[in-house]
């Protein structure tokens, strides 16, 4: 059995014995109260003994608080509670025993007397009480020993805690001391940081003072060294003089004093002369250096001026070269069209006027815009002529012109100043500038003359128009309306051509025109006055206009050409709705006039005079170009198509006195 079971059995036995004792005591008290008092006294004595023992056992712990009474009270309360719980069980057991004792008595011990039973029960009761008391003493002793053990452990823990507290206090003191030291060090460091600028200033002042002392000491050393050198030199000089004097004193073959003084005077005079020469030479050196510096400055200025002049000349040469290149390009462009013009002229002279096919007419239609562009470029490129009221009617043989110009330009460029002599350069430049100014003046005078002549012609034309009758003016207005209609038709034609495309083949261009129905051309008959007005000529004829008979011939020729072109178009089946074509033979003299005007613009009037003198025999055929020029009025300009199919004559606008009388006519 285990210890727990043993303890349970012992406790049960104790409680059962206690219950029996209580029952018996109650019975004995009823029977004999004396014995009850004795038992009470004995129990009280036992209790007192127990308390005395507990006090004796705890006497050694008088210094500390005694917890035995409280512990016993707690144990007694627990025991009483247990007794109250187990009283009914004990009563039932006692009843069973009593019944068993009765049965045994009834069977075998009927002879035993009541006194023996009482003594026997008393001895048993005493023995049980003694056992219970011993057991109580053992339990109390164990509990008290455990309590003492616990108290000792707590005392030991208290002592350990006291030791730990003392150690912690000592550590805290040490840490406080360290903190104070650290605070002092931090305060010193902060103070040192605050005092840093003061310390630095003190240090700098000390360094400055030390440097000043060093300088003073060095200066003193230098002065002392100079004094030493001076003294050394004086000593050497004195030694030399002493040696010389000793030698003189030792010499016995010396001359007389007069001779020596004479020699001294001669030597001194020579020395003075030498000094003067040296001074004069120094002055001459200074003067020569100044003169040389001046000459150098002058030469440098001259070189700078020459360099600037060379730079300007180089820039001018570059500009001239660029202009020459541009003019070469222009001449190349012009030469292309001049060759084409010549080819077209040869073609017109070779084979007769035959009605052109529809494909050729389509080609003429397909490229009107390129011809007009080329005409614009030719008009912009050709310079204005200085001759009286004459304009260029075509561009011919420009290759020969360009070659001659290219031959003459290097000749003029070679005349430019070279970089060898500055004086010649400046003189040449001044001459060239004068020459250019003269050329500009000549050109201005020629232009002014041309302007005056144009103004006079305009005034004459205005006067003649004012003298016209009102009937002729009424005839002009419907013609102006017809010209406006022609312009509108031409603009529509241009738009249609732009839509169809300029790069299409001639067959494609001819297709839309062949489909449409052919339109008969209308024939108009105008008076001479209206025809003259169409061509920009004065309308009035007769004696007042006797000088303008040339223009009447040109109008008749123009009308005949127009009728021939109408017949050609009627044969070919193609009738353009506007314009008229005219072919003009250009002679070689026009080229000469153009060349002379171009050379005059490029190189001045003097060069043109030289060329005129060199070629006097060319003036024979000058009448033919005049006739060709008279065929065109001064307000017209002719140009050929790029492919020579047709020729365009553009009539410039004439501005009369009233703005409504202005007129513009474009003929293809």
From Swiss-Prot:
Keywords: Coiled coil
Ranges for region Disordered: 17-44, 351-402, 495-520, 533-581, 605-668
GO cellular component, one term: axoneme
Disulfide pattern: none
Pfam family for this entry, one: Lebercilin
Basic and acidic residues bias spans: 22-31, 560-572, 621-632
GO biological process terms, semicolon-separated: intraciliary transport
Compositional bias annotation for Polar residues: 368-380, 546-558, 633-660
Superkingdom, taxonomy of origin: Eukaryota
Coiled coil: 148-259, 305-336, 420-440
Protein family: Belongs to the LCA5 family.
Protein name: Lebercilin-like protein
Annotated source species: Macaca fascicularis (Crab-eating macaque)
Taxonomic lineage: Eukaryota, Metazoa, Chordata, Craniata, Vertebrata
The gene coding this protein: LCA5L
